[in-house]
Amino acid sequence: MSIAVLGSGAFGTALAISLAGKGPVTLWSRAPEQARQMQETRENHQRLPGLPLPAALNVTADLDQATRCDTLLLAVPMQKLRGMLSEHAAALHGRVLVACCKGIELNSGLGPMAVMAETLPGTRTALLTGPSFAQDIARGLPTALTLACADPDLGRDLQAQLTTTNLRLYRTTDTIGAELGGALKNVIAIGCGACIGAGMGDSARAALLTRGFAEMQRLAALKGARPETLMGLSGLGDLMLTCSSDLSRNYRFGLALGRQEPFDRATTVEGVATAHAVAQLARDLGIDMPISTTVAQLSNGDYSVAEAMRSLLNRPLKEE
């Protein structure tokens, strides 16, 4: 089975680099000039400078060429996934689609698996998620991810196809749990970053991380996810990484909020849109998610970090 990665950002490029260690891989960029530069210089200077592209990796802006491959990894931001699927529906028809994004669509409240099912019904789909940074994958550092697929046979095939020497995949059929874990941790990471940025200390971050994880479990259970999925790589594992590293864009965005510093809005911060989607879901479902709701308000500028923390600390006392 042949592989193409659609999306030449940092994560898409990193996946393509890793997979090219096993055989030919196509990386598609929607920008012809970027594709030409990457193909000629053998480097993604903009997103992953200093990391060479293997000889087995072909970069192209020709979507028809890329979609001749059997398995397509969709490395696009969550809020742009539906548009890409709709725009290129004919080219994607009949292919196996693996979403490589994390988040909840703002307008619909759906995750990547549901968006793919709604946009391209009948398509065989999966989700690649878990604790990882593009630089680590591209450098060949040991990384473990979750491959979520409702079809066990397809899941086994994809697990074997996409596992590399240093990228190990664990599979699950719980696509709901894997989707929610990868999405919700970004919201909590913004809160943890804001906490540290405002100088509130590691103890406060530990409290936010732990109580945030309780919110993740609460919503996931209500949506039908299995508890063990949230305890795995796509939930707790991703949460721990994202809430503690400056390499996380969501955590860095929170740091900037806490320090009252500007942040590059051109940088994709999935947790912002997800926080607003989660706040709406919480209202619709009548579920208590105070940290996620507060992060949404904080990202809007409705609160300062100090005001947000006071609001959380002044909530009614309860059992853990």
Swiss-Prot record:
One of its GO terms (molecular function) is glycerol-3-phosphate dehydrogenase [NAD(P)+] activity. Keywords: Cytoplasm, Lipid biosynthesis, Lipid metabolism, NAD, NADP, Nucleotide-binding, Oxidoreductase, Phospholipid biosynthesis, Phospholipid metabolism. InterPro entries: 6-PGluconate_DH-like_C_sf (IPR008927), 6PGD_dom2 (IPR013328), G3P_DH_NAD-dep (IPR006168), G3P_DH_NAD-dep_C (IPR006109), G3P_DH_NAD-dep_N (IPR011128), NAD(P)-bd_dom_sf (IPR036291). The active site is at residue 185. Pathway: Membrane lipid metabolism; glycerophospholipid metabolism. GO terms for biological process: carbohydrate metabolic process; glycerol-3-phosphate biosynthetic process; glycerol-3-phosphate catabolic process; glycerophospholipid metabolic process; phospholipid biosynthetic process. NADPH binds at residues 11, 30, 102, 134, 249, 270. The keyword Nucleotide-binding applies. It is an enzyme of class 1 (oxidoreductase). Sn-glycerol 3-phosphate binds at residues 102, 130, 132, 185, 238, 248-250. It comes from the Bacteria. Its EC number is 1.1.1.94. It catalyses: sn-glycerol 3-phosphate + NAD(+) = dihydroxyacetone phosphate + NADH + H(+); sn-glycerol 3-phosphate + NADP(+) = dihydroxyacetone phosphate + NADPH + H(+). One of its GO terms (cellular component) is cytosol. It is found in: Cytoplasm. Coiled coil: none annotated. Belongs to the NAD-dependent glycerol-3-phosphate dehydrogenase family. Catalyzes the reduction of the glycolytic intermediate dihydroxyacetone phosphate (DHAP) to sn-glycerol 3-phosphate (G3P), the key precursor for phospholipid synthesis. This is Glycerol-3-phosphate dehydrogenase [NAD(P)+]. It comes from Ruegeria pomeroyi (strain ATCC 700808 / DSM 15171 / DSS-3) (Silicibacter pomeroyi). The gene is gpsA.
